[in-house]
């Protein structure tokens, strides 16, 4: 598991509300209405996290989601302005293919993947969502892919070879 990243040490974190859903629970007396929020936070410098929150009011659900996102920050390795290598992130029915892109090509990603890349500070990347299109599944799959990224020096150390080979 990745080590904990203290959100207070990072300074100013930006927030992006990806989705707000109205959810209901059917009880004997009728329906109970609540709101579910999915939020991305990041410092545009390699740190990004996502969280979910649920409450009877939208602002409270967003506040809970932001707190959850700050508790689940990850560090994203980069090479220049892009990611080190191609990776497939999977979570449930959601699959997201992340590919490095040449400098200046921008973020070619749709839906909930774009704000993740922007708040992580990755200006050049290509992403394709395969499988489930649900916002939560796509976000979880994207984060799975970002967690599986490895820098060249880490891979070289694992293989026991020097970086020049």
UniProtKB/Swiss-Prot annotation:
GO terms for molecular function: rRNA binding; structural constituent of ribosome. Residues 13-76 form the S5 DRBM domain. Keywords: Ribonucleoprotein, Ribosomal protein, RNA-binding, rRNA-binding. The keyword RNA-binding applies. InterPro entries: Ribosomal_Su5_D2-typ_SF, Ribosomal_uS5, Ribosomal_uS5_bac-type, Ribosomal_uS5_C, Ribosomal_uS5_N, Ribosomal_uS5_N_CS, Ribsml_uS5_D2-typ_fold_subgr. One of its GO terms (cellular component) is small ribosomal subunit. GO terms for biological process: translation. The keyword rRNA-binding applies. It holds the Pfam family Ribosomal_S5. Part of the 30S ribosomal subunit. Contacts proteins S4 and S8. With S4 and S12 plays an important role in translational accuracy. The N-terminal domain interacts with the head of the 30S subunit; the C-terminal domain interacts with the body and contacts protein S4. The interaction surface between S4 and S5 is involved in control of translational fidelity. Belongs to the universal ribosomal protein uS5 family. This is Small ribosomal subunit protein uS5. It comes from Oenococcus oeni (strain ATCC BAA-331 / PSU-1). The gene is rpsE.
